Amino acid sequence: LHEPPVDVRTGHAETLFESLEPGAGRRLRAYLDSASRIYGLAKEHFLYTDFRRPAALAHPDVLRALPALGPQLLGGLRSHVAARFQDPRLRQILGYPAVFLGTSPDRAPAMYHLMSHLDLADGVQYPLGGFAALVDAMAEVVREAGVEIRTGVEATAVEVVDRPAPAGRLGRLAARLPRPGAARGDEGRRRRPGRVTGVAWRSDDGAAGRLDADVVVAAADLHHVQTRLLPPGRRVAESTWDRRDPGPSGVLVCVGVRGSLPQLAHHTLLFTADWEDNFGRIERGEDLAADTSIYVSRTSATDPGVAPEGDENLFIL
C-alpha cells in the first residue's frame, strides 16, 4: 500500500510495463495477444453453451487450440503471470482479475488471463447513469417486446411435475435447458425427469398467486433455487452444498461524500504488500489484516449525475 501509484490506461499498458520492468512491454504484448485469442475462443464456443453436448467442445477451432489451451486449464494464473513478469506490481495488476471470478490468482486456471484482454485491450465501459440506466434500458426493450415486469413480488416456489415436456417449439427449448431432475436430491439418487408447470409468488402487500409456465429461468442465487424454490423431492441436499466451494463473498460499501476526492480515479485498486497473506486469510475464513486489498470506484469522476455538484459517489469493495 506504500508503493508510488501507477496509472493503468487502456492502450498504454505496454509503455507502463516497460517503464517498471525492462522488456515487460514486449512480454505484455505477447501476453495480451494470447489473452485475446483465448477470449475469442471462449466467447465463440464456451460462453453460450450449457456443455450438455460433447460436440460443443469438438469444434475444429477448439481442437486446434488444445495444445495451448490444455496447459492453461491445468496451470494456475499466478504461476502463468510469474513466469513472464518479475515486478510485484505487474504481477498484481495481471493477477487481481481473479478476484472478480470469486477466487485467487493461485487457484484460478491460467486460462483466465483472458480477463486482461477486457481490462487492458478492450477497455472498461461505463454507462452514464450507472448500471441503473442499463437496467432501465433493458426493461424498456423487453416491455416493447411484450414482456410484463412485476416488481415487489417474491417467487416462493417453482412447481415441477413428472410428465413429458410439451410438444412443439417450447418443448424443444425446454428439453435443451438443464432440468431440476438432472441433479442429485436429498436422497442421493437421481430423480425422474420432470418439467415445470408454474411459479408461485407472494407480493409485498401479502397477496399470493401463481403463474403458468412451460420454462422457468431462475436468475436468483443458485443455492436458494436448489434448496428453497424447488419441490422437496427435487431439491439439492444441503450436504451436497457443504462440499462445494462457492467462492468468497464480498463486503460492499456505498458512500456519498461531501466534498471532492480528486486523488481517486474512476477505478482505484489498493493492493496490500503481503499479497499471499491477504488471499490466504480469505480462503481460510480468517479475519482480514489491517492492511487488505480494496477496490474503490469513484463513479462521480466520470458521471456528474450520480452525486451533487462538488460531492462524490464511491463504491468500495
Name these PLM-found stretches.
Residues A55-A68, P105-A139, E144:
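Helix-loop-beta segment of a Rossmann-like dinucleotide-binding subdomain
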Residues H2-R107:
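Rossmann-like flavin
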Residues H80-R84, Y96, A137, V141-A145, ...:
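Generic, well-ordered alpha-helical scaffold segments in large soluble proteins
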Residues V141-T156:
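A conserved beta-strand/loop element that lines the FAD pocket in flavoprotein oxidoreductases
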Residues P105-R107, P304-D311:
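Short glycine/proline-enriched loop/turn "hinge" motifs that connect secondary-structure elements
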Residues T156-P178, G188-P308:
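Mid-domain catalytic core of redox enzymes
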Residues G23, A30, G76, G130-A137, ...:
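Generic recognition of stable, solvent-exposed alpha-helical segments in well-folded globular domains
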